[in-house]
């Protein structure tokens, strides 16, 4: 019974983290569509704040043993790659 509860908490934690990551990914995709992020410091600040918040959530979940450290790294790494692609796309547009 206890292992079912732990497993349920782990699944719920992962689902919540993935939902938060999806929200950030949508913000990135909107900016990719418009390539305006570097022109909008407020939007960049929002993305940075969201990424920082998610990294803290992931760290907390890892420390509680709700998700594996590798799962958290993969989740954050994917978002960082998308953010990097956004910056690269905007830079290429400017050239």
From Swiss-Prot:
The lineage of its organism: Bacteria, Bacillati, Bacillota, Bacilli, Bacillales. SUPFAM superfamilies: EF2458-like. Coiled coil: none annotated. Belongs to the UPF0358 family. It comes from Bacillus anthracis. This is UPF0358 protein BA_4159/GBAA_4159/BAS3861. InterPro entries: UPF0358 (IPR009983), UPF0358_sf (IPR036270).
């Amino acid at each position: 019974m206890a292992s079912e509860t732990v497993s349920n908490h782990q699944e719920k934690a992962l689902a919540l983290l993935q939902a938060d990551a999806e929200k950030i990914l949508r913000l990135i995709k909107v900016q990719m569509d418009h390539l305006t992020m570097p022109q909008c410091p407020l939007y960049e600040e929002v993305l940075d704040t969201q990424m920082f918040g998610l990294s803290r959530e992931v760290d907390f979940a890892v420390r509680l043993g709700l998700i594996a450290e590798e799962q958290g790294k993969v989740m954050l790494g994917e978002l960082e790659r998308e953010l990097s692609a956004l910056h690269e796309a905007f830079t290429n547009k400017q050239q």
